[in-house]
């Protein structure tokens, strides 16, 4: 199926609790994989405004992630530190590797990249820099503090 990204709705919402939502302001996702009817993995066309980030720094227990930079210069932050990615560069994040990652737009121009991830069940996302855990369920993500108490929605 051919997808014109201009026909895919913008998504600016986040599952994060209120105290973390401001960190992803300026992030716009288009679920182009869903628009194509994909079921086993997701593909998002993501735009980050200057100063925005892709997510809180995190890693997944069961789901692989991959990004491909299309436009702009973005900073990848991992356990190893910060690295600049430019158009054509890619990065992969294998499931189960305790190496939190996220992208930060520290430039003065928009960044556009593809974000690809599988949809393996029973995944957990760990956020090493924040008091947050996420566990996948049939109804979406369950967000808790690291001590297991639920965030109130």
Regions found by a protein language model. Give the residues of each.
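A short, N-terminal "cap"/entry segment at the start of jelly-roll beta-barrel domains
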Residues: 1-40, 125-153
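Conserved short histidine dyad/triad with adjacent acidic residue
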Residues: 26-31, 44-60, 98
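Ligand-binding loop in jelly-roll beta-barrel domains
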Residues: 37, 95-123
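Short connector loops at helix/strand junctions that flank enzyme active sites
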Residues: 38-41, 54, 61-64, 69-71, ...
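Short, conserved beta-strand element in jelly-roll/cupin
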Residues: 45-49, 60-77, 116-118
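Active-site donor-binding loop signature of nucleotide-sugar glycosyltransferases
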Residues: 50, 87, 118, 129
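Short acidic-glycine-tyrosine-enriched beta hairpin
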Residues: 79-96
